[in-house]
């Protein structure tokens, strides 16, 4: 039975994740490296545990979260699908059970908003964890004069948290934004599709998605 640590400590896996991040860096994208995928893995695991799923189901989501962006090593376009295929081969090499592989690659192949669908709880957890990782430290470009809208939005987020209510009915993405760096409407301009996807993912887990910015609930 494959464990998260087997994947996390795999030299091949780490090489491909780092290579994928370098590719995106060259294209001007925000950080998609080990910091991002580790955060997504942890959040996906925590979401399922909080919602009463088993430790094993949560660990499978953790693995999927760690591998979800690996396809960027091939190309940004269709990286969810190429990543699922790459993860399939890596997981087979690591001796993973076919059932676990099936769940993981389904989650990876359906996580990107252009072709996404929260088809199972693992995928839903990965989507929420991935789209919820908005933070200043993901911005590579430190020249404010050359920021694009994605840089501005991420750089403006001073604090972020993804939490599930005590009664397990709402998952809330709570952001503190510096409005001198980015207007709230700028956030909506690039994240509207993502927020719609988060709402669908939350529904898959019997949750309602909420977005709170600077103390005001907007969704």
Map each language-model feature to its residues.
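Short hinge/gating elements
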Residues: 21-30, 181
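Amphipathic, well-packed alpha-helical segments that form the structural scaffold of globular domains
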Residues: 21, 41-45, 88
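Short alpha-helix boundary/capping segments
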Residues: 32, 75-78, 186, 190
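Divalent metal-dependent catalytic cores for phosphoryl transfer on phosphate-bearing substrates
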Residues: 25-26, 36, 49-164
């Amino acid at each position: 039975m494959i464990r998260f640590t087997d994947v996390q400590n795999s030299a091949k896996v780490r090489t491909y994740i780092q290579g994928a991040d370098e590719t995106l860096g060259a294209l001007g994208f925000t950080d998609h490296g080990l910091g991002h995928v580790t955060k997504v893995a942890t959040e996906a695991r925590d979401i399922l545990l909080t919602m009463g799923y088993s430790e094993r189901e949560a660990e499978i989501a953790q693995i999927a979260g760690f591998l979800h962006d690996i396809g960027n090593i091939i190309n940004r376009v269709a990286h969810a699908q190429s990543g699922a295929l790459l993860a399939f081969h890596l997981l087979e090499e690591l001796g993973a059970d076919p059932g676990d592989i099936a769940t993981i690659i389904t989650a990876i192949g359906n996580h990107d908003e252009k072709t996404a669908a929260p088809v199972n709880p693992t995928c839903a957890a990965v989507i929420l964890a991935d789209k919820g990782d908005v933070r200043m430290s993901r911005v590579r470009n430190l020249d404010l004069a050359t920021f694009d809208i994605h840089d501005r939005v991420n750089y403006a987020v001073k604090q972020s948290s993804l939490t599930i209510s005590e009664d397990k009915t709402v998952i809330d993405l709570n952001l503190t934004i510096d409005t001198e760096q980015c207007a709230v409407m700028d956030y909506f301009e690039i994240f509207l599709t993502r927020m719609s996807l988060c709402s669908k993912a939350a529904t898959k887990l019997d949750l309602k998605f909420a977005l709170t910015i600077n103390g005001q609930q907007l969704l």
